[in-house]
Amino acid sequence: MQLIPAIDLLGGQAVRLHQGRYDQVTVYDQDPAALAARLRRACARLHVVDLEGARAGLPVQADAVRAVIAAFGAEGGSVQVGGGIRSAAAAESYLALGADRIVLGTAAVNDPALVRDLAGRFPGRVVVAVDAKDGRVAVQGWEQVSSVTALDVARALAGAPVAALLYTDVSRDGTQVGPNLEATRELAASCGFPVLASGGVGSLAHLRALAQIPGVSGVIVGRALYEGAFTLAEAIEAASA
């Protein structure tokens, strides 16, 4: 299971939200590009989210994303970018900046045809984010909850050359209380795509538990890493167990 650090961008800074709430923000680094360069020393892939873009529905932090991609990709690192990608033009712009993968969440619910089209044109470079609140997929920067489930999204994309599904339990994101192992296991067993797990990781034991779930190919970590619950080296070892 691949360990993938997250950099969430807000106002040009690296931050984390608590349970997806924009009124509960912790700033971890005022220079996201420098942070990305440090992470590249140990990690092959980075997960970057334009939080303002996720709310606005279009890229907002493009300059900060560009700097992060340049810093992390300077020595061959791969960056996946999400937040506000709801059009082909937005997707293409990030790929042109050097993103290895693009992450689409709201578009997967509201415009699955767009996701299928992009996956077909860029096979293996589209990640679909399914961010769940009480079992339903949240959209528009997690501020609205749709009527569909994570498995509904997966079924709508069956057969598309999607790289992975990124599953987040929003109620656990930024809490370090532990990931939703049951929901992650059920999705991985049923969706037909590799699953990236996210939300709630707070210990090495959480990473080891996720690593034992068949079909989970990666895990996104943020707050626990930046607040010292474990070192990057320890996390990579636990994820590989």
Curated annotation (Swiss-Prot):
Its EC number is 5.3.1.16. Pfam families: His_biosynth. Its main location: cytoplasm. It catalyses: 1-(5-phospho-beta-D-ribosyl)-5-[(5-phospho-beta-D-ribosylamino)methylideneamino]imidazole-4-carboxamide = 5-[(5-phospho-1-deoxy-D-ribulos-1-ylimino)methylamino]-1-(5-phospho-beta-D-ribosyl)imidazole-4-carboxamide. The active site is at 8 (proton acceptor), 131 (proton donor). Gene3D superfamilies: Aldolase class I. SUPFAM superfamilies: Ribulose-phoshate binding barrel (SSF51366). Pathway: Amino-acid biosynthesis; L-histidine biosynthesis; L-histidine from 5-phospho-alpha-D-ribose 1-diphosphate: step 4/9. One of its GO terms (biological process) is L-histidine biosynthetic process. One of its GO terms (molecular function) is 1-(5-phosphoribosyl)-5-[(5-phosphoribosylamino)methylideneamino]imidazole-4-carboxamide isomerase activity. Belongs to the HisA/HisF family. NCBIfam families: 1-(5-phosphoribosyl)-5-[(5-phosphoribosylamino)methylideneamino]imidazole-4-carboxamide isomerase. This is 1-(5-phosphoribosyl)-5-[(5-phosphoribosylamino)methylideneamino] imidazole-4-carboxamide isomerase. It comes from Sorangium cellulosum (strain So ce56) (Polyangium cellulosum (strain So ce56)).
